């Protein structure tokens, strides 16, 4: 009895679709020995179903009764990641289309093309088991789409690189995860372990050529972390998938249109270089927007204050100043601002956060613009000079406000003492130091009049 039990474990049961007479006689002999045996033996994990139930199951979405009772182990990618059809296939749909093309809709032994025969490891150039026998065209393969695999989370006998592998089961009830994770059902190329000798002769384990992709990814990632739900892969693994997709397309003679991030179907890069500074842009529109930096043109002018801007988007943001709408309010001091970015910069004052530090004197600043203006004081260069008094300034806007001192234009007037100032900043500073600690109290009419005179 012991010899019969060992013989039964070493030789797998015959394929229900093979229909060969030697396999039928062997199965009958095994059945007689099992009946005569008194020892209890485990039930077969898969039994062929009647032809009536077989026809009903062919219409269902989940294909349970295939040639192999073992689940088809396919290395998939993390959940929610879309890949081209050459890299990853929906093998359940593939088997449905293959059986229809071969004429094998029922579970009988005759009729239709033979499925899988006695092949243990599929070595066809297509990477899909029995595609050459079935004669499937590449158009029958499903297009690339998001596939939701079942993820194995147990760590029974798996190495550290096992967390990279996601498997899709055609029949997850046939074998529990504990048996699948035992190691005897996995190929050596997939888990970097020595496979049993009986694996090579197993006629019902279809190892696909895409297992090379998982093995290659394991070399790139020796100790990967678990991928969360619908999260993008890291850049090295994306590169592995991209290279594998290109190799598969070359073998099949099909033009690859990669949908991976960073992939481009256009082989000619579009580079537009600025002739003045040499800066490169990917579109002609961006180069056109950049050119006013060198020409000094400000075609977009504000109708209220007359200030010019290089871009229309900057003018739109500037117009919010004149509407006096300040929806963004500080929770600590109650000060309101026109834009949320200005509020975020203001919050740094309360937190004492000064990320921009001068490398010459160590002084910190809340804003990057103030930091750049301060650095000009260390250079000693004042290229903007007044034509009347020859006073020099670091920036052009300081020269613009200085010119108001020569034409007696002081558009910003204090509502308390009536003193005029060239800049609104000077008015706020005057009120904060002399009159109160709240802020400027200039009337709106005075501000509007000041901006009208300035324009």
From Swiss-Prot:
<feature type="region of interest" description="Disordered">
    <location>
        <begin position="1"/>
        <end position="22"/>
    </location>
</feature>
<dbReference type="GO" id="GO:0045665">
    <property type="term" value="P:negative regulation of neuron differentiation"/>
</dbReference>
<keyword id="KW-0479">Metal-binding</keyword>
<dbReference type="GO" id="GO:0000976">
    <property type="term" value="F:transcription cis-regulatory region binding"/>
</dbReference>
<keyword id="KW-0863">Zinc-finger</keyword>
<feature type="short sequence motif" description="Engrailed homology 1 repressor">
    <location>
        <begin position="27"/>
        <end position="42"/>
    </location>
</feature>
<keyword id="KW-0805">Transcription regulation</keyword>
<dbReference type="GO" id="GO:0001227">
    <property type="term" value="F:DNA-binding transcription repressor activity, RNA polymerase II-specific"/>
</dbReference>
<dbReference type="GO" id="GO:0030182">
    <property type="term" value="P:neuron differentiation"/>
</dbReference>
<dbReference type="GO" id="GO:0003682">
    <property type="term" value="F:chromatin binding"/>
</dbReference>
<protein>
    <recommendedName>
        <fullName>Fez family zinc finger protein 2</fullName>
    </recommendedName>
</protein>
<dbReference type="InterPro" id="IPR013087">
    <property type="entry name" value="Znf_C2H2_type"/>
</dbReference>
<feature type="zinc finger region" description="C2H2-type 1">
    <location>
        <begin position="272"/>
        <end position="294"/>
    </location>
</feature>
<dbReference type="GO" id="GO:0045893">
    <property type="term" value="P:positive regulation of DNA-templated transcription"/>
</dbReference>
<keyword id="KW-0862">Zinc</keyword>
<dbReference type="GO" id="GO:0021902">
    <property type="term" value="P:commitment of neuronal cell to specific neuron type in forebrain"/>
</dbReference>
<keyword id="KW-0678">Repressor</keyword>
<feature type="zinc finger region" description="C2H2-type 4">
    <location>
        <begin position="356"/>
        <end position="378"/>
    </location>
</feature>
<dbReference type="GO" id="GO:0008270">
    <property type="term" value="F:zinc ion binding"/>
</dbReference>
<dbReference type="GO" id="GO:0000122">
    <property type="term" value="P:negative regulation of transcription by RNA polymerase II"/>
</dbReference>
<dbReference type="GO" id="GO:0021797">
    <property type="term" value="P:forebrain anterior/posterior pattern specification"/>
</dbReference>
<dbReference type="Pfam" id="PF00096">
    <property type="entry name" value="zf-C2H2"/>
</dbReference>
<keyword id="KW-0221">Differentiation</keyword>
<dbReference type="GO" id="GO:0021953">
    <property type="term" value="P:central nervous system neuron differentiation"/>
</dbReference>
<keyword id="KW-0524">Neurogenesis</keyword>
<comment type="similarity">
    <text>Belongs to the krueppel C2H2-type zinc-finger protein family.</text>
</comment>
<dbReference type="GO" id="GO:0000978">
    <property type="term" value="F:RNA polymerase II cis-regulatory region sequence-specific DNA binding"/>
</dbReference>
<keyword id="KW-0217">Developmental protein</keyword>
<keyword id="KW-0539">Nucleus</keyword>
<dbReference type="GO" id="GO:0021537">
    <property type="term" value="P:telencephalon development"/>
</dbReference>
<dbReference type="GO" id="GO:0030900">
    <property type="term" value="P:forebrain development"/>
</dbReference>
<dbReference type="GO" id="GO:0043565">
    <property type="term" value="F:sequence-specific DNA binding"/>
</dbReference>
<dbReference type="GO" id="GO:0048664">
    <property type="term" value="P:neuron fate determination"/>
</dbReference>
<dbReference type="GO" id="GO:0007413">
    <property type="term" value="P:axonal fasciculation"/>
</dbReference>
<dbReference type="GO" id="GO:0097154">
    <property type="term" value="P:GABAergic neuron differentiation"/>
</dbReference>
<keyword id="KW-0677">Repeat</keyword>
<feature type="zinc finger region" description="C2H2-type 2">
    <location>
        <begin position="300"/>
        <end position="322"/>
    </location>
</feature>
<dbReference type="Pfam" id="PF13912">
    <property type="entry name" value="zf-C2H2_6"/>
</dbReference>
<dbReference type="GO" id="GO:0045666">
    <property type="term" value="P:positive regulation of neuron differentiation"/>
</dbReference>
<dbReference type="GO" id="GO:0021542">
    <property type="term" value="P:dentate gyrus development"/>
</dbReference>
<keyword id="KW-0804">Transcription</keyword>
<comment type="function">
    <text>Transcription repressor. Required for the specification of corticospinal motor neurons and other subcerebral projection neurons. May play a role in layer and neuronal subtype-specific patterning of subcortical projections and axonal fasciculation. Controls the development of dendritic arborization and spines of large layer V pyramidal neurons. Plays a role in rostro-caudal patterning of the diencephalon and in prethalamic formation.</text>
</comment>
């Amino acid at each position: 009895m012991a010899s019969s039990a060992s013989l039964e474990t070493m030789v797998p049961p015959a394929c229900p679709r093979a229909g060969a007479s030697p396999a039928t006689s062997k199965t009958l002999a095994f059945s007689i020995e099992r009946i005569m045996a008194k020892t209890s033996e485990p039930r077969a994990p898969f039994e062929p179903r009647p032809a009536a139930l077989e026809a009903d199951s062919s219409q269902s979405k989940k294909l349970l009764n295939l040639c192999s009772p073992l689940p088809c182990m396919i290395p998939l990618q993390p959940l929610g990641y879309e890949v081209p059809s050459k890299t990853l296939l929906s093998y359940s749909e593939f088997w449905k289309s293959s059986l229809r093309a071969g004429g094998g809709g029922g579970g009988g032994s005759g009729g239709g093309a033979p499925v899988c025969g006695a092949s243990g490891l599929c070595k066809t150039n297509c990477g899909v088991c029995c595609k050459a026998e079935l004669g499937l065209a590449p158009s029958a393969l499903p297009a690339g789409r998001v596939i939701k695999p079942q993820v194995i989370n147990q760590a029974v006998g798996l190495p550290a690189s096992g967390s990279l592998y996601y498997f899709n089961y055609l029949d997850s009830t046939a074998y529990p995860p504990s048996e699948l994770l035992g190691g005897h059902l996995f190929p050596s190329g997939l888990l970097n372990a020595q496979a049993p000798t009986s694996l090579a002769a197993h006629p019902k384990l279809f190892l696909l050529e895409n297992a090379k992709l998982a093995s290659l990814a394991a070399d790139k990632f020796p100790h990967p972390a678990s991928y969360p739900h619908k999260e993008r892969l890291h850049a090295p693994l994306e590169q592995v998938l991209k290279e594998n997709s290109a190799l598969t397309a070359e073998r099949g003679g099909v033009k690859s249109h990669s949908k991976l991030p960073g992939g481009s179907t256009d082989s000619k890069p579009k580079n537009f270089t600025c002739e003045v500074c040499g800066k490169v842009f990917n579109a002609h529109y961006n180069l056109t927007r950049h050119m006013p930096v060198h020409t000094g043109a400000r075609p977009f002018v504000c109708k209220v204050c007359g200030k010019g801007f290089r871009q229309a988007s900057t003018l739109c943001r500037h117009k919010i100043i004149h509407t006096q709408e300040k929806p963004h309010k500080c929770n600590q001091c109650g000060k309101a601002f026109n834009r949320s970015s200005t509020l975020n910069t203001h919050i740094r004052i309360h937190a004492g956060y000064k990320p921009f530090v001068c490398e010459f004197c160590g002084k910190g600043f809340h804003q990057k613009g103030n930091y750049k203006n301060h650095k000009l004081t260390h250079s000693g260069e004042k290229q903007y000079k007044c034509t009347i008094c020859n006073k020099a300034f670091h920036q052009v806007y300081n020269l613009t406000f200085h010119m108001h001192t020569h034409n007696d234009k002081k558009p910003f007037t204090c509502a308390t003492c009536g003193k005029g100032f060239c800049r609104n900043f000077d008015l706020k500073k005057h009120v904060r130091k002399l009159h109160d600690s709240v802020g400027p109290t200039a009337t709106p009419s005075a501000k509007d009049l000041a901006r009208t005179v300035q324009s």
